Amino acid sequence: SEKSAIFLILPEEDTTKNFMAGLMIQNLSRELFAVADENGGKLQNRAVLYCDEFGTMPPFDVLPLFSAGRSRRLTLVPIIQSLAQLEKNYGKEGSEIIQDNCQDTIFGGFAPNSQTAEVLSKALGNRTVLSGSVSRGKNDPSQSLQMMERPLLTPDELKSIPKGSFIVQK
């Protein structure tokens, strides 16, 4: 019941050891599932696995952790640079399952050619704004106002989010 933290730090320049992170997460989650099952299906203390650079790790059997972990008080927080990383490692279906099991998504900054910005823009939906124009003739000033729908944030607006700012999607 004592709280603790484990940090696994692997050198970025040597990817030959990346498989160890996946093995550790897989084995740790199996052990935590077993402990939860011995204690009525829930861990006494919530366990959270923060997986920075999750998208660069070799794929491992992570889907059960997403789908079965929450009810046992075990959460995996994947931190990725691009949704394309998930699709590359877990395929289209696996990527969708992982995304569907993430209750909250935090986005900050995008590469100029990022398809993730397109996906997020669509996911955020649209809003209705008042748009208008004024034109002036010699004796005929006219004004036109109309309600129109636009994305809440366009892909270009998402790509220009200032450093240190984030979009949180529930």
Task: For each feature predicted by the language model, list its residue ranges.
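Structural recognition of the conserved hydrophobic beta-strand(s) that form the central parallel beta-sheet
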Residues: 75-81
